[in-house]
Amino acid sequence: MTGSILRRAPLLGVAGLVVLVDQATKLLAASQLADGRIVQLLPGLINGQLVHNTGAAFSLFRGSVQWLGLLSLAVTTGLLIWVVRHRTPPFWQGMAVAFLLGGTLGNGIDRWRLGHVIDFLALVPINFPIFNPADIAINLAVLCFLVDLWSSRTSSRHG
């Protein structure tokens, strides 16, 4: 079992880094933007604006904190079991799992600890829901899964 976990250390390290960046930036945003202030982070592109989201992505299922907290716990547990029980995954699949694990855990920590998710990244040029680093990681997971799917189909055709 120890060897299995050690082989997964890079995957778990990426997930841990996602959680660390997510929680640290949320803590900073909560302290610096609590008064309703909007701060330019990347002028003309991204502003910092604090929002407490009691829903999921795009504020879907608003007010369903307990249900979403249980869902986060179930997904996190399922991913951890998958990581430990399965062989070392191909690169893109491993990155997808790492980003999904880190993003799910990052937002899950907020739900369990605060009763809402801290969102604070607002895209300036378009009207888009405010988001956070965990959301970015979850979207990167989808992208990595698609790249893995594409690369495995390409290699099966040519190999």
Swiss-Prot record:
Catalysed reaction equations from the record: Release of signal peptides from bacterial membrane prolipoproteins. Hydrolyzes -Xaa-Yaa-Zaa-|-(S,diacylglyceryl)Cys-, in which Xaa is hydrophobic (preferably Leu), and Yaa (Ala or Ser) and Zaa (Gly or Ala) have small, neutral side chains
Pfam families: Peptidase_A8
InterPro entries according to UniProt: Peptidase_A8
EC number of this enzyme: 3.4.23.36
EC supergroup of this enzyme: hydrolase
Keywords: Aspartyl protease, Cell inner membrane, Cell membrane, Hydrolase, Membrane, Protease, Transmembrane, Transmembrane helix
Transmembrane segments: 64-84, 89-109, 130-150
Origin: domain of life: Bacteria
Function comment: This protein specifically catalyzes the removal of signal peptides from prolipoproteins.
Protein name: Lipoprotein signal peptidase
Protein source organism: Parasynechococcus marenigrum (strain WH8102)
Lineage, broadest ranks: Bacteria, Bacillati, Cyanobacteriota, Cyanophyceae, Synechococcales
